[in-house]
Amino acid sequence: MQSREDVPRSRRLASPRGGRRPKRISKPSVSAFFTGPEELKDTAHSAALLAQLKSFYDARLLCDVTIEVVTPGSGPGTGRLFSCNRNVLAAACPYFKSMFTGGMYESQQASVTMHDVDAESFEVLVDYCYTGRVSLSEANVQRLYAASDMLQLEYVREACASFLARRLDLTNCTAILKFADAFDHHKLRSQAQSYIAHNFKQLSRMGSIREETLADLTLAQLLAVLRLDSLDIESERTVCHVAVQWLEAAAKERGPSAAEVFKCVRWMHFTEEDQDYLEGLLTKPIVKKYCLDVIEGALQMRYGDLLYKSLVPVPNSSSSSSSSNSLVSAAENPPQRLGMCAKEMVIFFGHPRDPFLCYDPYSGDIYTMPSPLTSFAHTKTVTSSAVCVSPDHDIYLAAQPRKDLWVYKPAQNSWQQLADRLLCREGMDVAYLNGYIYILGGRDPITGVKLKEVECYSVQRNQWALVAPVPHSFYSFELIVVQNYLYAVNSKRMLCYDPSHNMWLNCASLKRSDFQEACVFNDEIYCICDIPVMKVYNPARGEWRRISNIPLDSETHNYQIVNHDQKLLLITSTTPQWKKNRVTVYEYDTREDQWINIGTMLGLLQFDSGFICLCARVYPSCLEPGQSFITEEDDARSESSTEWDLDGFSELDSESGSSSSFSDDEVWVQVAPQRNAQDQQGSL
């Protein structure tokens, strides 16, 4: 052992006091951290205590206050009585805490009378105070919201708002908007407005006396909706039509507001094709009486004097001063509504680290869509995904082998994570049918056991359940929807699921040695099986038939078929070179029974060669350009493959690059798209 003098200078401690070592500070030993009495916690104590208090409440034991809930219009002594514990109510409910501890008159009374809440809602809320659980339904949710808002029960109030938001539909969206406005709930109001904007075209056609429509909105509510940029419409005429509908629903009372309402119409986006419609608009009595000058001024600014005079042969000279005011708003040139730029596009899903590509095969436009899987790419906890699209153009993505499920909202260009699935799987597929997401097939990622369980997710309730299992396990298969039935098909068998009876039925099998891809087109199932064989199944007749073979190329690496805007497309890619692959798109001619190369403009695609595709309606104005994923062929040939391997990709790319991330047999298994012909029709 070295002495102090023998220690090298570099290892000796420096001292500001002439080389003297600093005093050693006395610190407690390890045992000091474990002295004193041991503190233990009974993790079941709070739940057991609450359960016991609830049993006292049910048995009316040790209760110290009686709450009488009186129906509005009734006198004292006619209400329903609730025997409760002050401390429980005060601890759980801010309203009762103020009542019983704030020196109010009721704090000293054995009985308290309440008038502004109904007995049924109060019973549910008292149960919540004792249990932390609340039962919501369409019948009680609005009354519970009002009662919880009064009693300041924040959790119940927000649960009611979430319940209403998840049940928005065409028949109740305007009523929920009015409800949110009445209670000034900003989030619910925004969600209702977003739903109305997304379904504005359908709502503009509704006029049943049994349903609340856009005509039932107040002036302020209507103006807020008509001013939205996010209206999913193809023409500004739809906005004008709704404005007229609203005014004519109560012409006498609403007529004076006509000018303000029509200023929400973006006249600059009318075209010459709208001339007949505008001529009819100018002849409507409510327009001629209240706002002819406003509309004339806007049209003159939009079309100029020549076309304006053809629309309005004899301008109203007395309205020239007021029409000049409307020119200001027309000259602002507001943007197009969101729906005017909507397009059905082919979406490419590839490696988890990459964004998704949105491609129009006829115009060559390409954009990128964000991926929710990016954060998992480097951890390798997500190897692939399964995707499907709903009739409302929402894209659902299930990660593999994790339990995550996301939904993509095109108007917001964002992903929302939903409730976790019940099982981890790999090699599964997913489909959307009538408000439910179905997941089946694949195997357990740990044991490798093939799974027969079928998971079902309720979009409305954000909940999962297990439904009837498949009688045979599925791997290397496709899950597709035709009409109101679910079909699982592979090379050996095809099963049909009837959700109305929760049962699986056997169908005529494909009887092929290989299975590649399937999609729905014209209510029939098109399958690529033993390449280049294409077979078609007609569910109505229960028969298979063979059509023209798909184009065969020895260098083709990947085959995808999609239903794009009521056209059946075959998308192929070549074996990757320089980490890039050439993509070719063919359209099927049903009359001539042949595949036609439509002349894709993609060039060489720098993307995962094991991509899968589906079609969905998206909004290019919300997306980012995707040209960086395309390389001209001449540029690719000039690159050195050695330089590309060294400089173009990271270590992660070399380990799990697109050309080797999936085997040939697993490309279509691990990431399986859902293409529902009926769903695509809903996007037109």
UniProtKB/Swiss-Prot annotation:
Gene Ontology molecular-function annotations: ubiquitin-like ligase-substrate adaptor activity
- A single BP term in Gene Ontology: negative regulation of signal transduction
Top-rank taxon, per record: Eukaryota
State the UniProt keywords alphabetically: Cytoplasm, Kelch repeat, Nucleus, Phosphoprotein, Repeat, Signal transduction inhibitor, Ubl conjugation pathway
- GO cellular component terms given for this protein: Cul3-RING ubiquitin ligase complex; cytoplasm; cytosol; nucleus
Q: Which segment of this protein is annotated as the motif ATG8 interaction motif (AIM)?
A: 668-671
Domain BTB stretches: 63-138
Compositional bias per record (Basic residues), positions renumbered to this chain? 10-26
Start-end of each Kelch repeat: 386-435, 436-484, 486-523, 524-564, 567-616
State where the protein is found: Cytoplasm; Nucleus
Pfam families, alphabetized = BACK, BTB, KBTB_W-LIR, Kelch_1
Q: Which SMART domains match?
A: BACK, BTB, Kelch
Give the pathway listed in the UniProt entry for this protein. Answer: Protein modification; protein ubiquitination
Region annotation (Disordered) ranges? 1-27, 630-666
Entry's transmembrane regions = none
Where is the PTM Phosphoserine found along the chain?
29
Where does the record place Acidic residues bias? Answer: 631-654
Q: What does this protein do?
A: As part of the CUL3(KBTBD6/7) E3 ubiquitin ligase complex functions as a substrate adapter for the RAC1 guanine exchange factor (GEF) TIAM1, mediating its 'Lys-48' ubiquitination and proteasomal degradation. By controlling this ubiquitination, regulates RAC1 signal transduction and downstream biological processes including the organization of the cytoskeleton, cell migration and cell proliferation. Ubiquitination of TIAM1 requires the membrane-associated protein GABARAP which may restrict locally the activity of the complex.
Q: How does the record describe its quaternary structure?
A: Core component of a BCR3 (BTB-CUL3-RBX1) E3 ubiquitin ligase complex, also named Cul3-RING ubiquitin ligase complex CUL3(KBTBD6/7), composed of CUL3, RBX1, KBTBD6 and KBTBD7. Interacts with GABARAP; the interaction is direct and is required for the ubiquitination of TIAM1. Interacts with GABARAPL1, GABARAPL2 and MAP1LC3B; the interaction is direct.
Q: What is known of its domains?
A: The ATG8 interaction motif (AIM) mediates interaction with proteins of the ATG8 family including GABARAP. The BTB domain is required for interaction with CUL3.
Instruction: Name it.
Output: Kelch repeat and BTB domain-containing protein 7
Q: Which organism is it from?
A: Homo sapiens
